[in-house]
């Protein structure tokens, strides 16, 4: 299997290109044999060799003289480069120099020999470019005039072409590293390329003599673009510095290429664009070359079997960092607006990588969450006490789980918002599965670890966990209320099971105390209730390590239990009172007990106001003697507690021993009337079984 490291080992002979866009020259290719032969033969010819033969007929001689005069006129233009070679005190800036070529150069005096031009070019004197051009034109004129053999023309043309080879090397050498060139020299190189483009267009206007090889168009502007492409490849392929610890080789490579491209293009915009003629499209040319090489590199990389991290990094660069941090950076955005570089990878490849990323990331999140839950459950079973935070039992499980989820979500959103939306739905599914596993693990702990010393504090720590889960999911995940309830349903069960376990021993202690109501036939209800409240009060400090909201909710559970157990005692049919006075006395006891229960529970945090009417209204039913009044009270009671059934009503009416059976049936039928009230969100009488 191919490895990533193999791909990034670089190519043989590749060297680092330090700095920012210094356009360092790669070793020049050896000249071809034909070029070397042409160069060798140049020493045998002079500019006179390119003129018509002296043995030409008179007419041809006259024509040659006219052309010689014309060539002298061409020298006038070239003098701008030969005069004033000495440096002036105040050398002009490159931006002040004229780089536009003159279409018809004129010369003063005879042309230098080919050997002299060769020597000048070898010394980098670009000003002789115009004289090389003049030789080319003289050759064309000689060929057009006739009188010279084809062999002679071909031989002389080879001399001119050899000079052009030297000139091209010099010009492209300057343009390969434009920031290293003197301003005037760069201006000369640009002017030569522009002039050559003009000559290409001129040559396209008519055919050459049959004996001459077609050497135009030379396409020097296109050659320059090729040089830029080579520079881009050298810069981007350079081996980056040693990868910082924690970064993969691929990550270092991405960072190197991205940073190099951005910095180099900024240099092009700031320093080269003002100097290059518009026809060069210098910003577009460099941008396209860097983009092409960057894209080629990533396309090749995408063919490898990438690890999870490199898949993510590749997408991050293609979809986010490259278009946003490079192409749309403050210095480049406006310049690259019309270039249309496009994406580094084709859409099909991007979709494939995105699918791979989503699969990898969801699998990773699932494994990390499962591991976090496993470690947490091990701490419970090993009887490790939970942490204490602000006086509350604390577990890191919820924080760990939500951080894992959040990191996966953030990574996806860093690629694109669309990928972020895709992974959101997948992560919600995995979170729901994790919460179900959490509930199962917690239930198993409740069942098997009752004898552990830290059993109860670990229960409270897990109940407290629910708060962080609820608030974080509700704030971060914008989902519907129903979806949120379904997602968090396992936590509601976990909390309820935790409450049941924490309160189990208390409720067992209260059971014999509630039995005293019926055992004493409500002879001492005040004292009995005081004993019940004292027992509850002594157990409450333990629950201070719950979060405030859960401590209040726990107290609501206690409140419900007290009211429920009290009603159960009233429904036992053990007490039958035949006089109105006895019934009114019991009603007063019930009211007093109801006030005591309500006051105690409210003082300790219960917000179950829905329970406030449960006992007082039963007391009122017992107190009333008029059948019609009792019916109204029963109907009202049923609207407050829709789960109040005929069985419960029969049990309460059984206390009223002076009520005729016919009236009992009439009162009971009131519950057959549909009041339109829906099932209550909190059950009360459905928790009470009557016989």
Curated annotation (Swiss-Prot):
Gene3D superfamilies: 1.10.357.50, Exocyst complex component Sec6, C-terminal domain. Keywords: Angiogenesis, Developmental protein, Differentiation. Residues 33-45 have a biased composition (Low complexity). Residues 12-31 have a biased composition (Polar residues). GO terms for biological process: angiogenesis; cell differentiation; exocytosis. Pfam families: Sec6. Residues 91-107 have a biased composition (Basic and acidic residues). GO terms for cellular component: exocyst. Residues 9-111 are annotated as: Disordered. The keyword Ribonucleoprotein does not apply. Coiled coil: none annotated. It comes from the Eukaryota. Belongs to the SEC6 family. May play a role as a mediator of inflammation and angiogenesis. PANTHER family: EXOCYST COMPLEX COMPONENT SEC6-RELATED (PTHR21292), TUMOR NECROSIS FACTOR ALPHA-INDUCED PROTEIN 2 (PTHR21292:SF4). This is Tumor necrosis factor alpha-induced protein 2. It comes from Mus musculus.
